[in-house]
Amino acid sequence: MAAYSAAALSWSSSSLLGNYKLSKNAPLGTAKLVERTSNFTIVCQKKTKKIRKIILKEDVQELGKKGQLMNVRAGYYRNYLLPMGMAQIVTPQLLKEMKIEEERIEAEKKRVKEEAQQLALIFETVGGFKVKRKGGKGKQIFGSVTAQDLVDIIKAQLQREVDKRIVSLPEIRETGAYTAELKLHPEVTARVQVIVSAN
């Protein structure tokens, strides 16, 4: 059902005669003007713009990202977004499903963060990981200690799989103690000691 706005206008009869009209009782050949005022109202109707509340099923350039709720014009939705399968009308059932999905995602994020915190605690309580390398002159070692070396040691000692891409290790070419960082989660970083000694 369309919504309408109305504007009322007042209008008098013929603007050429003003507020006068020719009398029907005047004899032939003569014209008698009789003053007459008649007002009536004209209602102008205009359709208001229809807006649809939608949810995007995929990223739409210059409009929004997948899962975003927004208001768009009905024609844009009907002629572009709907045929392309990019959006759907928001219903109470859909809102309920979205809320359940958001709660599930939040619970999963919380669980992953807690696991990362527990793993960080394990790494930090271990103390240090010992690496042996063939010694050279003074404190120098042959080769270097890499992130992959640390990952292999963690797997051997703690039976934990760690991706070498999360390991940040300074360049190690001498014996001594170094600190490595493991980015286990965007909000959780574990710092571990790497103790390098010569054979």
Swiss-Prot record:
Can you tell me where the transmembrane regions are?
none
Q: Which GO terms describe its cellular component?
A: chloroplast; ribonucleoprotein complex; ribosome
Name the predominant localization.
plastid
Q: Which UniProt keywords apply?
A: Chloroplast, Plastid, Ribonucleoprotein, Ribosomal protein, RNA-binding, rRNA-binding, Transit peptide
Q: Which organism is it from?
A: Ipomoea trifida
Keyword hit for ATP-binding: no
> RNA-binding: is it a keyword of this entry?
yes
Q: What is this protein called?
A: Large ribosomal subunit protein bL9c
Give the family this protein belongs to, as stated in its UniProt record: Belongs to the bacterial ribosomal protein bL9 family.
Q: Where is the transit peptide?
A: 1-44
